[in-house]
Structures are given as structure tokens and as C-alpha cells.
Swiss-Prot record:
Belongs to the TRAFAC class translation factor GTPase superfamily. Classic translation factor GTPase family. IF-2 subfamily. Residues 73-441 are annotated as: Disordered. This is Translation initiation factor IF-2. Residues 106-121, 148-177, 213-234, 242-258, 279-322 have a biased composition (Acidic residues). It comes from Salinibacter ruber (strain DSM 13855 / M31). InterPro entries: EF-G-like_DII, EFTu-like_2, IF2_II, IF2_N, P-loop_NTPase, Small_GTP-bd, T_Tr_GTP-bd_dom, TF_IF2_bacterial-like. The gene is infB.
């Protein structure tokens, strides 16, 4: 996904294309392949890249192209500024090579005074030579040695002819003339070799510039005439002034070129010998400085080639300075020198040259061919002077070299860089694939809550509401836009439009967010301790001793049936306080124990020392471990003789509860709730555990807590027990409790004393709720009662619709199976109790009694007395009313007698469960089994008119009776099952024949009786079944 950072500046697309030297389509295609489609915004000239990551990936991908583009720009900039720089470099080279040039000029003047003006160097021909020389360095270095031996240049021949005979006063010399003769000889030989190499440049280069013909002609003429004349003639010809010589006509130059070509072959050997003989003397005379004739020749060249006047002017300036400067000798070092230019003195970037089109080069060559012959002669002479008799590199070679360089750059990415790029591309591709799969999956999945409306579902799938309603209407369902749909209907609509449904938890749009407290505002609070354990293990007795009150006496059956919350200040422990929650131990109160574990800080697990770890004990351990609540074990009833604390610790270890005596971290104490032994030690360990936990709360804020219990009391209305977890609850505070709301009209503590406020970890009985919230609901103080009422009404609406949809329904296949097996029985119940926790516990326990044949259907449950409306509902639904700790009103009692509705009331919860179990067992069809009564053997058969076949039998075992069923077995195979139609003994009808007697009998609708058949008599017995859950 494209992300625009603050520091990144958007890049125009055309700028990026120019920077990377790639096409715009290529950039767009690459971004789409790499998954950066959103990184490109706009179109046309306004197209730009807004994602920094995409821009960096582009630069890395096309780094080679960008490098090539940068180099081309650099070459172009150098070409634009190259004129003066090249002139300066050329001038320096001329000064350094002044000594060999002076010798060459002397020999030429002696041989051919008329062509003295041709010794000058026009700038037009010199432009390409300095620039192209580095580019052609490798080629010239490789071919120079061989070519130098084969074809010595004309300059060398002229130098050889004039080196020995030129007078010393004709040209000034520098201080290099005083060097030793040996050093001069060596330098002269090196210069001669270099001149030979420079003279043998490829002919193609000279042809490209159109100057090679003139060079070869002049060089050949000079060499031939130098060999033909003797030393005296050369000496007398040397001092002739070149200034007075007129310019040689172009026609004569061409003629000389043709004749020189013929004489070149015969003169090559003579040139080699002359070069060897005169090389030492040439060094001695070499340091001659350029004469005034060179300056005049420059002026002439400038007039002949006005297009290159700027370069000529720079050259004139260099020549004028050359009259006073002295050139120093240096030793040429082989192939590092091309022509008269030292490549070591040039910077690497100077070798780069602007890439020119081939068409442009061709046009330039054609233009040069059309130039004036005199202009060509000037270029030829100037290049001869510049290049030492050899042609410089032309534009085609520069172009070829540049092409090769660019190709190397394009293919020059390292293997590691390519591997990195492939890995990055593969990683991007995998990430894009994962994103596409996630997007594809999310596009076809609808996350909806149960019972969404038709309009909401239509918005989720992106279809008009009318189309969804039409789809349901075609399926036989008439719905409205605001009607809430059940799960099956939602799945049907989603399937019609090609979606899958994923049901999520109901998102309460009216959820109340509780602000986090500042750590500086938190203060220590009392721990909330829940007492848990099995039935009759002494939980309430232990709590009673701590509270110094007899709570058990008020509990029916001696068991706790409510969750009691008590706030106790311990006088023996520096007035520290503990909030106790006493949970029931009966199995029906599993939900209460689970909620108690979630609302508590520490769990006291009470285990009787004379008993062992029981099922409810294991359940309490699981609740505490699931809630991640620390446990403190209280081994109770240590005052009894049969108490065995070690046995209890060992059994707790089996349940993954390791006490400190067994190397664990769970504290334990041996106590007796009857005598009080060990109670203080137990409380000390509880307080120590709370100090380790560092329990804190903020009392200076609006209260929030959890509902511990709710009930309906006469004269008080709905009473809820709230455990405040944070803040302070005061009288008059508006609150929200689950799906109900209200305002605190009054508050009482556990001893029923009225209080005005309660702080953290303190329980309170709150009056003023408009209903009975469920146990475990969140209790939150709101800003106003109206706000709380609005949120509660929205919650009630959702809850009401969900309850209507969640009514138990029997599917069609279940109905078919039950009809095949027999009648399906269902017991309808209406449950009323004094508190909400008891209603929930009793309902959950009864619903567990459901089997395939019988089931419990709770059609209504509530808190409070049994009313007349409950009786009428039971009459209409053929239900039984169960009351737990409540009684019917007078009107309800009369209505039940009139409508013949059964009302049963209980004070102990397990008594109600047992009665319902018995009622369900009565609805079960009895179990049928077969009981064998006797066996008889057929010894004879005879036919009786109007009766049929009669068998004479002997009873071997048991009895044979008239009302019994009979089974005929022949050769071990059952042939027939039926009933006995008649039974006689000595022509008298009898009802039963005992074992050891004979009788005659006939089987109803069966006459195929044979001697030896065995008859078995039996009866079907029905037995009542027990309910197995």
C-alpha cells in the first residue's frame, strides 16, 4: 500500500523518466508489476510518484540506466566546455614536444622551403585529436610498435636530414642542450620511436577527417628530398625564411600527393636507415623553439578556416607564449603516450565524450569533403604538426568506443546485486500474492452479527434493499426493511449473492468505555477473596467464624444458595479489611462459581481434612486457574480425629496444586472453623498474598463494579448486590447494569445497615434498578439517568430479539426420527425464584436433563413471586410452575385451582431437580423385554374339524399358558412366532399346563406342525426406565 511520508517530495513522472533514462511506459509497467499501482497519481504531464518506497525501488531497478544517463550528460557538458580546455591541453603538449618538433621543422625547411606554411597546426584538425586520443589509446598502443617499424613518417625523415647540418645560431636552444650526450641520445631515440608510432595511425581515422592524403604527401616529399640532397645543401637551405614563401596552390599539392604515393614504397628503407643514423644528432638540435613562421602560419590558417577561428585564436596565444617558454625533456614511457599527448596528465572524466548520432558524423564528413582544398591543406599540415605525422582518432572510433562502454555499463551489474534484486522481487511478489489472497477472501466473507436487519444486510453485500426483499419473497419469505433476520435467512441471502457468512459477537454500539486511571491517583485497596470448595466442607462456617455471626442458621438445608458478599475489618490485623465472596458448593451453581472467580483477587480453597478432593473441589481449582487467580488452601475440620492433612496435600498435588510443603508456591493453612484454630494464620497468608499483588484503585472517580446478586423484595422492589471495583458509589448516582438502568435510591451493607457511599472492594445492596440484571453484568455509573436509560433500552431491544430467535426448534429430520421411534415428550416449565442467580442455576440444571425422547422446555423464568399471569401462561402452554424460595400470590393460587395448573415450590434447589427428573422418567416409554415361561415337545399331530391341526405335546420345562406367546423351532431354526389359540388336557380347556404333563394345543393361523418340533412360550415384560443424562 502506498504511503506518503512527510519528508518525501513528490516526483513528476517525466522528471523520473529523464533521470533514469527509461521510457514512461516502462516505468508504469514496472510499478504495476511490483504492486505500486497506487504510488502513481495523475495523468499526462501531471503524473507523479507520491510513494517514497516506489521511487527508491525504481532507482535501484534502473540504477544502470541512470548511471548511463548521468555519464551522457557529463559528456555533453564536457563537449560544450571542451574547446578552451582541449586547446590548453594541446598547447601544453606542443610545448613539451617542442624539441623533436623543432628538429623536424628544420629538416623540412631545408628540403622544401616552399611549404613552410604547412607546418602550422590549425585548430580545426586539432579538435578531435586531443579528445579522441584517450579513447583510441588501447588501439594505438597495440598497433604502434609494428607499424612504426614498417612505415617511418615523413617528419622523421626530415628530422634526420636536418639534424646534423642545421647551424646552431638559426634557432635558440634551452638548457637541455647542455645535458650529457648519452642522455640526449636516449631521449632522441625514444622521441623517434614515439614519432614512428604516432605516424602509423589507422588510415580510416585519417580518412574520417579528410586530412591523411595531405599529410602523407608532405611527409613523403620531405623524406625523399632529404635523402636526395647532401649535408651541405640541407645546411644552406635551412636558414631560408619561411615567412616570404607564398602559399602552395591546392592543385600543386594534389600533384605532389600523387607523386609522393609512388615514391613512398621505395623510400621506406632509406627512411629507416636515416632515422637510425641521425637520431642522436636530432636530439642535440631538437630543443629549437617555434619560429615566427609558425605564428604567421596560424594567422593564415585562421583566415582560411573561419569556422574554427576560436580554436585558432587560442592556439595563437599559446604560440606567442611559446617564444619565451622553454620545454623540458622527459622520457616517453611506451604505450601510455598517444601521439604527443600524455594520457597520465589527463583526468579520467576527460575521456568521456558526448555521444553523437552516426548521421551527424556522416553529414560532418561530407561537409569536410566539400571544403576548400586550401582549407584541407591547412588542416593536413596542422594535424601533421600536432600528431607528429600520424592521423588521430576519428568520430566513428569514438562512437564505437562509446557504444562498447555503454554496453559494458548496462551489463556491468554485479551478480550479488542481481541476486539481491531477484530476492527482493520474489519477496515483493509473495507479499502481493498474500495481499491478493487476503483481499479475495475478505471480499467474499460477510462478517455479520446475529439478527441483522434486511437493510443492514443489503448494505453489507452492496445490493439494493428491494432486490434482497424480492429474493426472500421468491423464496417464500415476506420481510420488511427493518425486520431482523435469523441466521438461516442471512446464510440463504449471502449464498444467493455468492458470499460466505461469518457470524461475530454482537457489537454493542452503546458500549460504555471506562477511562484508564493515572497511576498517581491509585491507592491501595482491600483484597476481594472468594471462598470456594465442595458441599459441606465448611466454607460458610469458616466465613461465619471470621464475621462472628451465624450465617448458616439462616440457610435452608444447611447449604449456601446465594452468593454472599461481606466486607470484614480485621481487628487483630491492624484494622485491615477483606471483602469475602461466599459461593455455593452445589453442582447447580457452576456459573456462580465461575463469576466469583472472575470478580475476585484471591481464592481460598476449602478442603475438608476428613474427606478428600471432591468433584466441586476440582471444579473450583479449574475456575481459579482459568481466571489466573492465586489460591490459598484452607484444610478445614482439623479438629476431627480422622483428619489427614497429608492426604489432602497429596491429592491437591495430583490436581497441579503444589503447596509450599511440597515445593510449590501455593500457601496452605490447617484450620478448624469450629474451634477457630489456624484462622489468624490463614488471614495472614491472605494479606501477604495481597501485598505481593499490590492491589490498587482510584476512589476519586465514578464507580464501576460487577453485579453479584439480584432479587425482588417486597417493599423494596429490585435489589441488586454490587461489588465496587473502582471509584466511589454514592446515593443518587445514575447507573447502567446490563440491560437495565436506574438511580441509586438507597444503599445497605451486608448487615442491612443503610450507608451513603461505598469505595473500592466494598459490596452494597443497591435499590433503584428498573429490573433484575443478570449476575455478572457490568455496573457503571453514567453522567445522567437519561443517558443510562437510552443505552439500556437499546440493549433490551437487541436482547429481546435475540431471545425470540433462540427459542429451541426441532429440525425436520429429528421430527421424522422421533415419529418413527415413538412419541416425543416435552415437559414445559415456568421457573420463578427469589434471586437471579438461583433462576439461572435452576434453569441450567434442568436443561441438562434433556435426552432424545424427553426434554425440559423453560418457556419463562423470572425473579419474584408467582403471579396470576404466570398461571395463565402455564395453562395455555400446558406447563408446570416451579417456585424456588418464592410463593404464589392469593390470586395466583385461586387461578391455579380454577385452571388446574400444578404449582410446586421448593426451598432446596436439588429437591426441585430430583422432582423434575422423576417427572421426566415418567414421560419415558417403558423398557420392553422378553421373559421365557416354558418349553414343550411335539410328539404327535392330528387334524380336528373346525379347529385345524392340533399338536400333542409334552411339557419339558416351565409352564405353557393360554395367554402366552409361542415360538416354533424346527431343527434349531425359528419357523413361526404367534399366540396359542387353544389349550386342552383330556378334552378340557385349561389355562396352564405344568412341566411333566401332556397337553394338546393349536397355534393361531398356523397348521404346519410336525413331530419333533420344539415350542417355546414367553411373555413381554415392560419396565420403567431411568433418566440417563
Amino acid at each position: 500500500m502506498a504511503t506518503k511520508t512527510k519528508d518525501f517530495q513528490e516526483k513528476k513522472l517525466f522528471q523520473v523518466v529523464r533521470e533514469l533514462n527509461v521510457s514512461e511506459d516502462r516505468v508504469v509497467e514496472f510499478l504495476e508489476e511490483e504492486g505500486y499501482e497506487e504510488a502513481l497519481s495523475g495523468s499526462g504531464l501531471n503524473a507523479k510518484i507520491v510513494d517514497e518506497e516506489a521511487y527508491l525501488v525504481l532507482r535501484e531497478e534502473y540504477a544502470d540506466d541512470a548511471e548511463v544517463a548521468a555519464r551522457i550528460r557529463e559528456l555533453r557538458s564536457e563537449e560544450d566546455d571542451g574547446g578552451p580546455e582541449r586547446d590548453e591541453v594541446a598547447t601544453l603538449d606542443e610545448e613539451q614536444a617542442a624539441e623533436p618538433e623543432s628538429a623536424t621543422e628544420t629538416a623540412e625547411e631545408a628540403a622544401e622551403p616552399a611549404v613552410a606554411d604547412d607546418e602550422e597546426e590549425p585548430r580545426a584538425s586539432g579538435d578531435a585529436a586531443p579528445e579522441a586520443a584517450p579513447a583510441e589509446e588501447d588501439t594505438s598502443d597495440a598497433t604502434a610498435p609494428a607499424d612504426a617499424e614498417a612505415e617511418p613518417s615523413g617528419d622523421e625523415a626530415s628530422a634526420e636530414a636536418s639534424a646534423d647540418d642545421a647551424p646552431a645560431d638559426e634557432a635558440p636552444t634551452d638548457e637541455a642542450e647542455t645535458a650529457p650526450v648519452d642522455a640526449a641520445d636516449k631521449d632522441a631515440a625514444a622521441i623517434a620511436d614515439e614519432q614512428k608510432q604516432a605516424a602509423q595511425e589507422p588510415d580510416a581515422e585519417a580518412d574520417a577527417s579528410g586530412q591523411d592524403t595531405g599529410e602523407e604527401t608532405s611527409d613523403t616529399d620531405a623524406a625523399t628530398e632529404a635523402d636526395a640532397t647532401d649535408d651541405a645543401e640541407a645546411e644552406s637551405a635551412a636558414p631560408e625564411p619561411t615567412e616570404a614563401e607564398p602559399e602552395t596552390p591546392a592543385d600543386e599539392t594534389e600533384a605532389e600527393d600523387v607523386s609522393a604515393d609512388k615514391e613512398t614504397a621505395s623510400a621506406e628503407e632509406a627512411d629507416d636507415h636515416a632515422s637510425d643514423e641521425h637520431a642522436p644528432d636530432e636530439d642535440a638540435e631538437a630543443p629549437e623553439e617555434p619560429t615566427e613562421a609558425e605564428g604567421e602560419a596560424d594567422d593564415t590558417t585562421e583566415e582560411e578556416t573561419p569556422a574554427e577561428g576560436a580554436d585558432d585564436a587560442a592556439d595563437d596565444e599559446a604560440d606567442e607564449e611559446g617564444e619565451t617558454l622553454k620545454a623540458g625533456r622527459y622520457r616517453l614511457k611506451g604505450p601510455s603516450v598517444v601521439g604527443k599527448m600524455d594520457s597520465d596528465q589527463l583526468q579520467r572524466p576527460d575521456r568521456k565524450r558526448k555521444r553523437k548520432d552516426k548521421d551527424k558524423d556522416k553529414d560532418k564528413s561530407s561537409k569536410k569533403d566539400k571544403k576548400d582544398k586550401s582549407n584541407k591543406k591547412s588542416k593536413s599540415k596542422g594535424k601533421k604538426q600536432k600528431g607528429g605525422g600520424g592521423g588521430g582518432p576519428d568520430e566513428e572510433d569514438i562512437e564505437q568506443t562509446l557504444q562498447e562502454t555503454l554496453q559494458e555499463l548496462e551489463q556491468g551489474a554485479s551478480r550479488e546485486r542481481q541476486r539481491r534484486r531477484r530476492r527482493r522481487r520474489k519477496r515483493h511478489e509473495e507479499e502481493r500474492q498474500r495481499r491478493r489472497e487476503r483481499k479475495r477472501e475478505q471480499e467474499n466473507i460477510l462478517e455479520v452479527t446475529e439478527f441483522v436487519t434486511t437493510g443492514e444486510l443489503a448494505n453489507l453485500i452492496g445490493e439494493p434493499v428491494s432486490d434482497v426483499i424480492d429474493t426472500l419473497f421468491d423464496a417464500g419469505m415476506m420481510v420488511s426493511i427493518n425486520q431482523r433476520l435469523d441466521t438461516e435467512t442471512i446464510e440463504f441471502v449471502a449464498d444467493e449473492y455468492g458470499y460466505e457468512v461469518e457470524f461475530v459477537a454482537e457489537r454493542d454500539t452503546q458500549a460504555v468505555e471506562v477511562e484508564e486511571d493515572d497511576p498517581e491517583d491509585l491507592e491501595p485497596r482491600a483484597p476481594v477473596v472468594t471462598v470456594m470448595g465442595h458441599v459441606d466442607h465448611g466454607k460458610t462456617s469458616l466465613l461465619d467464624y471470621v464475621r462472628n455471626a451465624n450465617v448458616v442458621a439462616g440457610e435452608e438445608g444447611g447449604i449456601t444458595q446465594h452468593v454472599g458478599a461481606h466486607y470484614v475489618e480485621l481487628t487483630d490485623h491492624d484494622n485491615e479489611a477483606i471483602a469475602f465472596l461466599d459461593t455455593p458448593g452445589h453442582e447447580a451453581f457452576t456459573a456462580m462459581r465461575a463469576r466469583g472467580a472472575k470478580a475476585t483477587d484471591i481464592v481460598i480453597l476449602v478442603v475438608a481434612a476428613d474427606d478428600s478432593v471432591m468433584p466441586r473441589t476440582k471444579e473450583a481449582i479449574n475456575h481459579a486457574q482459568a481466571a489466573d487467580v492465586p489460591i490459598v488452601v484452607a484444610i478445614n475440620k482439623m479438629d476431627k480425629r480422622e483428619a489427614d492433612a497429608e492426604k489432602v496435600r497429596a491429592e491437591l498435588a495430583d490436581q497441579n496444586v503444589l503447596v509450599e510443603e511440597y515445593g510449590g508456591d501455593v500457601q496452605s493453612a490447617e484450620v478448624s472453623a469450629k474451634t477457630g484454630d489456624g484462622i489468624n494464620e490463614l488471614l495472614d497468608k491472605v494479606l501477604l498474598q495481597s501485598e505481593i499483588m499490590e492491589l490498587k484503585a482510584n476512589p476519586n472517580r465514578e464507580a464501576s463494579g460487577v453485579i453479584i446478586e439480584s432479587r425482588l423484595e417486597k417493599g423494596r422492589g429490585n435489589v441488586i448486590t454490587v461489588l465496587v471495583q473502582n471509584g466511589t458509589l454514592e446515593t443518587g448516582d445514575p447507573f447502567l447494569a446490563g440491560i437495565h438502568s436506574g438511580s441509586v435510591r438507597a444503599m445497605f451493607n451486608e448487615r442491612d445497615n443503610r450507608i451513603e457511599s461505598v469505595g473500592p472492594s466494598q459490596p452494597a445492596l443497591v435499590l433503584g434498578c428498573d429490573g433484575s440484571p443478570e449476575v455478572g453484568d457490568q455496573f457503571v455509573v453514567m453522567d445522567s439517568e437519561g443517558e443510562a436509560r437510552d443505552v439500556a433500552q437499546e440493549r433490551q431491544r437487541i436482547h429481546r430479539e435475540q431471545e425470540l430467535r433462540r427459542q429451541s426448534q426441532v429440525s425436520l429430520d429429528q421430527v421424522s426420527r422421533q415419529m418413527a421411534e415413538g412419541e416425543f415428550h416435552e415437559l414445559n416449565l415456568i421457573i420463578k425464584a427469589d434471586v437471579g442467580g438461583s433462576v439461572e442455576a435452576l434453569s441450567d440444571a434442568l436443561l441438562k436433563l434433556k435426552t432424545d425422547e424427553v426434554a425440559v422446555n423453560v418457556i419463562h423464568s423470572g425473579v419474584g413471586a408467582i403471579t396470576e399471569s404466570d398461571v395463565m401462561l402455564a395453562r395455555a402452554s400446558d406447563a408446570i410452575i416451579l417456585g424456588f424460595q418464592v410463593r404464589p400470590t392469593s390470586g395466583a393460587r385461586e387461578a391455579s385451582q380454577r385452571e388446574e395448573v400444578d404449582i410446586r415450590t421448593y426451598s432446596v434447589i436439588y429437591a426441585a431437580i430430583e422432582d423434575v427428573r422423576d417427572a421426566l422418567e415418567g414421560l419415558l416409554s417403558p423398557e420392553r423385554r422378553e421373559e421365557t415361561k416354558g418349553r414343550a415337545e411335539v410328539r404327535d399331530t392330528f387334524s380336528v374339524p373346525d379347529v385345524g391341526m392340533v399338536a400333542g405335546c409334552y411339557v419339558n420345562e416351565g409352564t405353557v399358558g393360554r395367554n402366552q406367546k409361542v415360538r416354533l423351532v424346527r431343527d434349531g431354526v425359528v419357523q413361526y412366532e404367534g399366540e396359542i389359540s387353544s389349550l386342552k388336557r383330556f378334552e378340557e380347556d385349561v389355562s396352564e399346563v405344568q412341566s411333566g404333563y401332556e397337553c394338546g394345543l393349536s397355534i393361531e393361523n398356523f397348521d404346519d406342525l410336525k413331530v419333533g418340533d420344539e415350542l417355546e412360550t414367553y411373555v413381554i415384560v415392560e419396565e420403567a426406565r431411568e433418566l440417563e443424562v
